């Protein structure tokens, strides 16, 4: 009986915490910790997206700490649209979706037929970004996360419960500022 309850709890928690988003992975180069001016490349892959309630994948948003220079983000390629809907992926620094979701920076899908719908593609999807650590004397937050949105969350589709998947954590850390060294002061 305990085994059955344990299995049910595991299945329930998987369903609650990962409704649409399948396996995710990432690499980061170079490995941290980071100092001001360091340039970092992140590669992220979402292996699959389950279309619960015909909820199509719509966007990949970067969740970044305050220690990153937002104006240095360079996106490479796009997430891909294997067997997907007509349309294209657009890199966007800021966009407000019909649901009121303030989005950016990240990739969002621009559907070729129906505005504000995602793509029917189930993946895999890969993104790559390069960014620079801010010049600072403080240990500012350098977390990096990726949030995946379906068109139900962005307001383009309404067919029952939306997927509510947590952000995927790529990196947790703070800027490691180089200590300022000064010579001894001589009062003679």
Model-predicted segments: where are they?
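Low-complexity, intrinsically disordered segments enriched in Ser/Thr together with acidic residues
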Residues: 100-142, 151
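Bacterial Sec-dependent N-terminal signal peptides
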Residues: 1-25
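Serine/threonine-enriched low-complexity regions used as flexible
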Residues: 132-169
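Solvent-exposed, conformationally flexible loop/turn segments
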Residues: 31-39, 120-124, 188
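Enriched but not universal
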Residues: 4-6, 178-188
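A surface/secretory-pathway sequence property marking extracellular, secreted
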Residues: 66-110
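Serine/threonine-rich, low-complexity linker/repeat segments that form flexible spacers/stalks
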Residues: 19-55, 167-181
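Low-complexity, serine/threonine/proline/glycine-rich extracellular segments that form mucin-like
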Residues: 36-84
């Amino acid at each position: 009986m305990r085994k059955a309850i344990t299995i049910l709890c595991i299945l329930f928690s998987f369903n609650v915490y990962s409704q649409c988003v399948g396996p995710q992975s990432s690499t980061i180069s170079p490995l941290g910790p980071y100092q001001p001016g360091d340039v970092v490349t992140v590669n992220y892959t979402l292996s699959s997206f389950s279309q619960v309630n015909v909820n199509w994948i719509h966007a990949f948003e970067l969740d970044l700490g305050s220690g990153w220079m937002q104006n240095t983000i360079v996106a490479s390629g796009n997430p891909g649209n294997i067997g997907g809907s007509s349309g294209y992926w657009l890199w966007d620094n800021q966009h407000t979706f019909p649901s009121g979701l303030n989005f950016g920076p990240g990739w969002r899908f621009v559907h070729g037929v129906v505005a504000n719908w995602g793509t029917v593609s189930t993946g895999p999807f890969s993104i790559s970004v390069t960014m620079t650590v801010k010049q600072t004397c403080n240990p500012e937050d350098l977390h990096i996360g990726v949030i995946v949105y379906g068109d139900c969350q962005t307001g383009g589709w309404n067919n029952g419960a939306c997927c509510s998947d947590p952000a995927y954590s790529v990196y947790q850390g703070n800027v490691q500022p180089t200590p300022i060294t000064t010579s001894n002061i001589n009062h003679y």
